[in-house]
Amino acid sequence: MTVAEVKGTFKLVCLGCRVNQYEVQAYRDQLTILGYQEVLDSEIPADLCIINTCAVTASAESSGRHAVRQLCRQNPTAHIVVTGCLGESDKEFFASLDRQCTLVSNKEKSRLIEKIFSYDTTFPEFKIHSFEGKSRAFIKVQDGCNSFCSYCIIPYLRGRSVSRPAEKILAEIAGVVDQGYREVVIAGINVGDYCDGERSLASLIEQVDQIPGIERIRISSIDPDDITEDLHRAITSSRHTCPSSHLVLQSGSNSILKRMNRKYSRGDFLDCVEKFRASDPRYAFTTDVIVGFPGESDQDFEDTLRIIEDVGFIKVHSFPFSARRRTKAYTFDNQIPNQVIYERKKYLAEVAKRVGQKEMMKRLGETTEVLVEKVTGQVATGHSPYFEKVSFPVVGTVAINTLVSVRLDRVEEEGLIGEIV
């Protein structure tokens, strides 16, 4: 990537999903090519500040408002640009600020840099060349969602599903692999919706698998109803796809899944798990769960706990239900008291932790390839193909973004501990 002389300074703030992370990296690369220099010290003001926000929950909105205020305070003369879902969901907040911010809609995210500069020039393409501070590269393949789950505000903020051209995606992945990235994560708001003409997500993965130099392919997250026969075959048969999936659950109760407007049942979810494990009995899963959805009974909650144990997730991301205006669930009866949600979430976290550690115990004595993501002092940390977090003492020199063979010796609070072999 060609860099011009320094014309000014910029700061980037990213909140939320992996798609947002991809977009912020694209802004970083565009600005660098244009000759702007990134400021990483929060105490040093910049000329331009861009914040990519999230509004998936009320808590995410609150974090976004705080981050915007902080940017305004720390960068008193900067041009503040806000994009992402908070800009779509809470325009009143920005109208109430003493400081004027430029709002760029989600639909115009890819043209953000063009919109904020008035001078006439050829702007760099909205794509990534690397992924700052990451050992894996997130590649956005799709945006928007057509599912309209009853709790989710995202379709109203990001719009309908739109897929990127496969050729652009493949070229972008080849570029980051050439830069030395071993692992790419196929990311989107609803990745299972991906479709470029006759090219499905399955065919895209098969083509990514053929890119010279790629070592690992993951899908950021996917719903069980999107796992078609073709996609299952692509994931389990491709040479570089990892034997793990973030398979979204949300609830283990059929009645709650129906009220959520999810497109699968408890049985469908378990069938999907078993199908993957037929190809690899050790196939690993992580998931998301919403705790305290309106009407969630004690039995519904027990159903969720039981499926966590039955599947043996290595990690569960749990979220308290957050009532979002414009969604169907916002008006549902039988809202669960906050204290009950808090207690259930705490208990679910304890169960999930125990289950995850039990699953990792099964790996002890094995040797696995770890992609190094961080080296702190004499300890390196990364993930196995099964997405288990692995730490090990450094022997000699171990570089970030390299694959290292590690024998797994024990399980501790944060994951597996091993030794280089």
From Swiss-Prot:
InterPro entries referenced in this protein's UniProt entry, alphabetically: Elp3/MiaA/NifB-like_rSAM, Methylthiotransferase, Methylthiotransferase_CS, Methylthiotransferase_N, Methylthiotransferase_N_sf, MiaB-like_bact, rSAM, rSAM_horseshoe
Designated gene of the protein: mtaB
Name listed for the protein in its UniProt record: Threonylcarbamoyladenosine tRNA methylthiotransferase MtaB
Ligand binding ([4Fe-4S] cluster 2): 145, 149, 152
Domain spans labelled Radical SAM core: 131-358
Note describing how the cofactor binds: Binds 2 [4Fe-4S] clusters. One cluster is coordinated with 3 cysteines and an exchangeable S-adenosyl-L-methionine.
Organism placement in taxonomy: Bacteria, Pseudomonadati, Chlamydiota, Chlamydiia, Chlamydiales
Catalytic activity: N(6)-L-threonylcarbamoyladenosine(37) in tRNA + (sulfur carrier)-SH + AH2 + 2 S-adenosyl-L-methionine = 2-methylsulfanyl-N(6)-L-threonylcarbamoyladenosine(37) in tRNA + (sulfur carrier)-H + 5'-deoxyadenosine + L-methionine + A + S-adenosyl-L-homocysteine + 2 H(+)
Alphabetized UniProt keyword annotations: 4Fe-4S, Cytoplasm, Iron, Iron-sulfur, Metal-binding, S-adenosyl-L-methionine, Transferase, tRNA processing
Cofactor(s) in the UniProt record: [4Fe-4S] cluster
Gene Ontology cellular component terms for the protein in this record: cytosol
PROSITE patterns, per database record: MTTASE_N, MTTASE_RADICAL, RADICAL_SAM
Pfam families in the record: Radical_SAM, UPF0004
Molecular-function GO terms, alphabetical: 4 iron, 4 sulfur cluster binding; metal ion binding; N6-isopentenyladenosine methylthiotransferase activity; tRNA (N(6)-L-threonylcarbamoyladenosine(37)-C(2))-methylthiotransferase
Organism this protein belongs to: Chlamydia pneumoniae (Chlamydophila pneumoniae)
